[in-house]
Amino acid sequence: MPLIYVLDTSAVTDPRLREIFGVKTLDGVVREYARLLIRSHIVLGAEFYTTPSTALELRSFLERNNVSREAIDMLMGAITIRSPDLYTTRIPAIIMSDWIHDMLIRITKGLRVAEDSVRRAARRGYDYGVAQDKKGFEESVAETIHELREKYREATRKGVIDTRVDFDLVVLAHEINGELVTNDTGIMKLCMQIGVKYIEPPRFINKLFLLLRERTGRV
C-alpha cells in the first residue's frame, strides 16, 4: 500500500513535535522534519503533498516565527504542492446540509456571546463612569473586546471547517486517497464524515520513525 500523506499547517507547527524531535526551537523542528520526509521518500517511497494555499500559509507562519529561509526551503522541497480537483470531486450533499445546520447553531451562540459582552461592558462602563476613572474604563474596554473575541471564536469556529484552505486539504486527500496529517478538530470531523483517513502530527512522525526502523534498522 503506497504511503501518501497530505500535510496541514499544523502537521509542522504542532508544539508537541519539539519533544519528539528533541529540539527546542521551531527552526529545529522544521529541519528535522525536512530530513525525515526526504529519508522517508527515499527509503519508503512515501509521498507528501499539500495545497498551494496551505503551502503559502505554512511558509508565512514559519517566516513570522523566525524560521530560517534555508530550513523553510528544505521543508518545502520535500513536499509536492498540488491543487485539489474542485470540479469533479464529489462530496455527499448531506455534508453541506449538516454544515449549514451546524453554522446556524454557531451563529446563534455567537450572538449570545456578543449580547453578554455588551451587557458586561455596559455595567463596567457605568461603574467606571461613576468613579470617573478614564484609564480604568479604557482598560476594561480592551479586556472586554479580548474576551469577546476569544469566546466568539470558541462558539463559532472551533471544531468546524471554516476556511477554504482547510476544505481544499480534505478534498485533495479524498482525491488522491491520502492520509491527512492535522490536529485541527474541524478538519478531522469532515474527514470522518466523508471517509478520509487522518492522523495527528505526533503519531505521524512516530509512524515514519517506526517504518524506517523496521526497514533499515535505524532512523
Swiss-Prot record:
Q: What is this protein called?
A: RNA-free ribonuclease P
Q: What is its EC number?
A: 3.1.26.5
Root EC class = hydrolase
Q: Which residues form the signal peptide?
A: none
One GO BP on record is: tRNA 5'-leader removal
Q: Name one GO molecular function term.
A: ribonuclease P activity
Note the superkingdom of the native organism: Archaea
The entry's function note states: RNA-free RNase P that catalyzes the removal of the 5'-leader sequence from pre-tRNA to produce the mature 5'-terminus.
The answer on whether this UniProt entry bears the keyword rRNA-binding reads no
Q: Kindly name one Pfam family recorded for this protein.
A: PIN_5
Question: Family assignment?
Answer: Belongs to the HARP family.
Q: Which UniProt keywords apply?
A: Endonuclease, Hydrolase, Nuclease, tRNA processing
Transmembrane regions listed in the UniProt entry: none
Record InterPro entries: RNA_free_RNase_P
Q: Which reaction does it catalyse?
A: Endonucleolytic cleavage of RNA, removing 5'-extranucleotides from tRNA precursor
Organism of provenance:
Staphylothermus marinus (strain ATCC 43588 / DSM 3639 / JCM 9404 / F1)
